[in-house]
Swiss-Prot record:
Matches recorded under InterPro entries: CysZ_sulfate_transptr, Sulfate_CysZ
GO molecular function: high-affinity sulfate:proton symporter activity
Single biological process term from Gene Ontology: cysteine biosynthetic process
Keyword Transmembrane helix: yes
Protein name: Sulfate transporter CysZ
Topological type in the membrane: Multi-pass membrane protein
Family, per entry: Belongs to the CysZ family.
Length: 267
């Protein structure tokens, strides 16, 4: 049973993300994710326009003749599945390309919210940390891709693929959005990936409502240009309130979680 209070909190942290990106000390760290977002969305929009007719045709051919009277409704679900597929491609690419910048933004947001000085280092220290950040993105991909492939293939199953599967895909995508953006502050503290998933699962309603709003805004023109830094800021605020003190109380790995690994380039 999803908690009504947690659902409201997900909305709160998402709106808090919008507030945080306007703060003076954070604006310069928001610019690069936005620029990368514009480039990626432009390329994927072109790909979507050129391929959507072909993909819809493939999905609609899987519908048996005796369900032709449902074709209009099933067409909507087919389009939804394709949108989610392109959304997954977008978030995967943006995750790999913008990971260092998002980690840095999460660090700055946490510093602003807590008032604590986080570990800072040189540009070289930052560069050395990039492979670890990209490795974390690879973990997310390994976790999500097999599940999405299975769901996509099930989308070709008559009736099931055009009714139940799109709903499951939507919920799973919302869950992945929570994982994608909440992971930046978790990873800054070297919290293992499996621990991060378990913590978010304990507050599933909070995670799904936050991730669902991020997913929804990705489909809104212009709004989707800034949704990545908004999500990073909101997820970091969620980390500070719900997870930071709790996880700092127990040793999660040999390196611990008290040291922030993402370094500052600009003081």
């Amino acid at each position: 049973m999803l908690s009504h209070a947690e659902l409201k909190q997900g909305f709160h942290y998402f709106m808090m993300g919008w507030h945080l990106i306007t703060q003076k000390g954070l604006r310069r760290f928001v610019i690069m994710p936005i620029l990368l977002n514009i480039v990626l969305l432009s390329g994927l929009f072109w790909l979507f326009i050129t391929q959507i007719e072909k993909m819809i045709g493939m999905l609609m051919l899987s519908i048996p003749d005796w369900l032709s009277w449902l074709s209009s409704i099933l067409l909507i679900f087919a389009i939804l599945m394709i949108l989610v597929l392109f959304y997954f491609v977008f978030t995967t690419l943006s995750g790999f390309i913008a990971a260092p910048f998002n980690g840095l933004l999460a660090e700055k947001v946490e510093k602003m919210l807590t008032g604590e000085n986080l570990v800072e280092g040189s540009v070289w220290d930052f560069m050395k940390d990039i492979p670890r950040m990209l490795g974390r993105e690879w973990q997310k991909l390994v976790y999500s891709l097999p599940k999405l492939i299975i769901l996509f293939l099930l989308g070709f199953v008559p009736v099931l693929g055009q009714s139940v599967i799109p709903i499951i895909v939507t919920l799973f995508t919302a869950w992945m959005m929570a994982i994608q953006y909440c992971d930046y502050p978790f990873d800054n503290h070297k919290v293992p990936f499996f621990v991060m998933k378990a913590e978010l699962a304990e507050k599933r309603a909070l995670s799904l409502s936050f991730g669902g709003l991020v997913m929804l805004c990705t489909f809104i023109p212009l709004v989707n240009l800034v949704v990545i830094p908004v999500a990073v800021c909101g997820a970091t605020a969620m980390w500070v309130t719900h997870f930071r003190d709790h996880l700092a109380m127990k040793p999660l790995n040999q390196e611990g979680v008290s040291r922030v690994s993402t370094v500052s380039i600009v003081k």
